Structures are given as structure tokens and as C-alpha cells.
Amino acid sequence: MAPKSLAEQIADLEDLTPRDYDPEDIERGGNSSDEDVEVKDANAGREHYQAVGKAKLRNEGPVSLGKQYAGSRVSRDALEAESDEDPFRARSSDEESEDESDLEDEDEDGDEDEDEDISEGSEDERPSKSKAHSLKGREDADVGMDSDDSEEDEDGEGFDDGFSDEDEDISGEDDSEDDEDAKEEEEEEEEEEEEEEDDESEDEEEKTAKPKRRVQFANAKVADTSDDRAQLRQLLATDQKTIAATISQAAKADATKGRAVKHQRATFDALLNARIKLQKGLTAANQLATRTQPSEDADTDAFKSAETAALTLWSTLEDLRLTLVDAQTQDDSKKRKRPSPATTSTSTSSLWKRMAELESDSLAHRRAILDKWSLKVRGSATATTLANSKTKLLGTSGAQQTITAVLDAHVASETTDRSSKRLKSTQGSTSDPNEVKVYDDTIFYQSLLRDLVSQRMSSTDAITNGLDTLHILPSRNGAGAIHPITGMRKDKVKREVDTRASKGRKMRFDVHEKLQNFMAPEERGTWTKRAREEFFASLLGRSASGILREDDVSDDEDGEKSDEDVEEGGLRLFRS
């Protein structure tokens, strides 16, 4: 700010209006004064400086570095190709899923290789360019100085007075030294230019050869990747087909096995059902009397009808067995010829002979089939059960016995004398040497029933079948409970006893579920004494006792009341 004059200062003193001082104005004034001082200090002592224009190096325009630094067009194959300087890059054809990532890595490597090639060429050319650029800058500076000197001479202003003769001598010596340096630099430039031309020719040859090799390598690599992908797709397709076929075959095999097991279980249940129905007949047949001479009065018609029915059943069974034997024989020439049907005239010996021949022909095949499927379907639980039953019957380990041996042992143990199975036998029958043998498979029959009951009880249909509601009968000795059908003995269950409930350490009580949430009702239907008194007192204005006393009058009072009116006597209750 310019200093105020005397008149302005006097005017400020005479002005009585209050002034508001802003602290920011003081700061602004101080800053402005400091800036003025700094500007003055910065320009002080530089009045004799000559104004010089901006140098070419300081121009903001782009600097032309040459053709070798200019960009060039590159094909996509050459861009994606791998660098020739990395020929030992391993690439696995099995890992085809990582081809895309590998291609991207190779593209990045190719770009880096190109950048390295350019950087190598630029490093060779930088010294020459920098030197040439520095020489050109010096020449331009010399030319600028000469032009400035000429302008100063033409203007003829009074700048020569500020320079002395000594300065002119120094400037002359500097000019001579600059001329010598310029000559040396020109010679160096010529040598460097020749070297640059040689390098450029070599670089051009390398540039023309590299794209060709890259294109060839890229084509070979694309062909390899396409072949690898095709092979991988083919392998995947075959693997998928193989896996699908394996899974389908396994599923079909499991389904077939399941259907076969269901069919076997159904057949076994049907046979067991038939055996259960025949149990009563077998028991009754074992209790039949010995063969006696028929009496003359016997009914011949009944015998003939029974004989005809038995022969019909026997013929049906024989036809069934012949059909099974023919199904086992594939050769038609070896099939058995069907005999004539049995009649009443056929002898018993011929019938027995035909049965024995059929049995001998089918025995080997039946035993082989039984052993085969017994080994296949034998599980851990079944094996344990069979082993226990075999050891009881044979006294040997169950693993060493086959199903046919077990069946033979059952048959041998079940064929006994008739006399031993009779409940009541005579003395003469026990000593008869020609006693007839009978068949009794009670042990085997009970084992079949046990297996059936355990299977049904373990299945989910145990509740619906009602097997869990069977009554358990107590045994005689109290060791356990016996099932009424299977005869199996249930192990005795140990009663749980609380050992801490003795000596008063724990209260003994039983909670009745029906009484747990029960509340006794209040009897509100009958009248109590208090309720009756309250009712009559509120109704008649008197207590019930007083009302009841009026009824207990003496005989004298009754005589006096006889003269009164009946209506008046009836209203006596309402008198005061």
C-alpha cells in the first residue's frame, strides 16, 4: 500500500465514526507486503540481464527419436507365438484343461521378448543418438549466440560499454576451443553413423526373419493343441461311455439279484406254508396203527376211492419231476421217455422202482444246486445260526459241513422207530423186530419256524402281523419265558434295582400317570346344614331352626288352634 498523505491522515483523525477491524485484513496486508518485498528482492541486481528465448530442449512438442522407435504392425499369430529365445519350455499334453492359461502365459512371454528385442536395439542406438543430439544442441546454441551478437551489433545500443577488452579476449579463446571440439565431434559422428547403418541393416534382417519363424512356430503349436484337444475329447467320451456302461451293468445286476432273492423268498415261504399245513397229517400218520388184516366187513368202495386218489396224486408228482429232469437235459436224445400212467393194476414194486430211478437221476443235480446257492447266500447271521444247529446235531464245526450233509444228518436223526414216537405202546410192540420206521422232523420243523418268526419280528411288518403281541408263557423252572408257537425260551431279564434307595437315602414312591394331573372336584350338588339355614333366612326372614320349632308344638296348643280358622292358621308364618 502507498503511504497516506498528510491531508488523508488529518481526515482520518477528524472522522469520529468507529471502525471495525478485521483480523484477516491485517494478515492480508502482511502477506502482500511480504510478497512485495520478496519480489523486490528477487528482481534486485538483475536489471542488466539480457532477455533470452526458451531453448529447443525445453519445447513441449514431441521429440522425433527415429524410425527404429516407431511402432509397427504385428499379426495375431506372431503376437500369440512363443519367443524363440525360450525353446526349452516344457508343456504337457495331458493337462489339456490348463491350455488356455498356458496360451495366455505364452502370449505374455512373447510380448516381453519383443520388448526385450526393442530395448536391446535401443540400448545400442542410445549413445549415438544422445551424442548427435548433444552436438546438434551445441550447434544450435552457437548459432543462437551468433545471431544474438549480430542483433546486438545492429541495434547499437549501449551494451558494449559494460564489457571490457579482457572479456573479448576470453571469448575469442573460447571460440577457438569450441571449433576444435566441434571438429572432433564431427569425426566421431561420422564413425557412429556408419556403425548405426550397419546395426540397422542387421536389425532389419533379424526383424524380417523373426516373424517368419514365429508364424511357423505358432502354426505348429496351434496344430499340436488341436490334436491334443481332440485326443482328450476322445478319451473323455470313451471314459464316459465305459463308466455309464459299468454303472448300468452293475445296476442291472443288482436289480436281477434283488428280483431273484424276492422270488426265492416267495418260493421258500410257499414251501414252508405247505409244510405247516402238512404237519398235522404227518403227526396223524405217525400215530396210525400197525398193518393188520382187513376184516371181511370192510368197505371196499372206500378203499378203492382212496387208492384212486393216491395214484392220481402220485402221477401228478411224477409228471412234475419228469418235467424238471427234462428241463435240466438240453440234448433231446437223452431225455427220458414218459412211462404209462399208473393204475390200480400197477404193482407197488414197479411204482417204487420208478420213484427210485427218478431220485437217482436228480440227486446229483439237486445236491450241486443246493451247495452252490447255499455258499452264495450264506451271510454272517445265517452262517452263525447254521453253525450252531450243525454243532448240536453233528458235533463238528459248521464251516466244514455243506447244506447237503446237514440235510442228510437231519434225515438220519429224524427217521426213528414208530414205537419210540408213540405215546402209548404195548409190551408186544416194543419187542417186535419188524417194527416199521416213521419220519419225524420235529427238530427241523421247529428250526424253520424259529427262523420265520425271527425274520418277521425283525422286519417292519412285525406290528401289522401281530407277532409282537403273542403271549409269552412262563416256564416251569422260572428260568425264562417260552414262546407258544416256536418254543423258544426267552432269557430272564434282570430287574433294575436302585441301590441308593436303602436306609432312607432316597424316598420310594410310584407315580400314577392317571392321578398325576388329577384334581378332586368339589361337591356342590348336595345341601349342607349351613346352606339350608342361609337359604331359609334369606327367604322368610327367619332362620331354619326357628321355622322348624314352630312345627314342634305341644298338644295343648293344637287344641287351642283347632278353633281357629284354617286359613288364618296357614298364614301364621307371616305374623310378627
UniProtKB/Swiss-Prot annotation:
Acidic residues composition bias: residue spans: 95-123, 142-206, 552-568
Keywords of the record, alphabetical order, are: Nucleus
Highest taxon in the source lineage = Eukaryota
> Would you tell me the Gene Ontology cellular component terms?
nucleolus
Which Pfam families does the record cross-reference, listed alphabetically? Answer: AATF-Che1, TRAUB
In the UniProt record, does the keyword Nucleus occur? yes
Annotated spans, Disordered? 1-227, 328-351, 414-433, 548-576
Q: Where in the cell is it found?
A: Nucleus, Nucleolus
Bias regions of kind Basic and acidic residues — which residues?
A: 39-49
Q: Does the record carry Nucleus as a key word?
A: yes
A GO BP term here is:
maturation of SSU-rRNA from tricistronic rRNA transcript (SSU-rRNA, 5.8S rRNA, LSU-rRNA)
Q: Which family does it belong to?
A: Belongs to the AATF family.
Q: What is this protein called?
A: Protein bfr2
Lineage summary? Eukaryota, Fungi, Dikarya, Ascomycota, Pezizomycotina
The encoding gene: bfr2
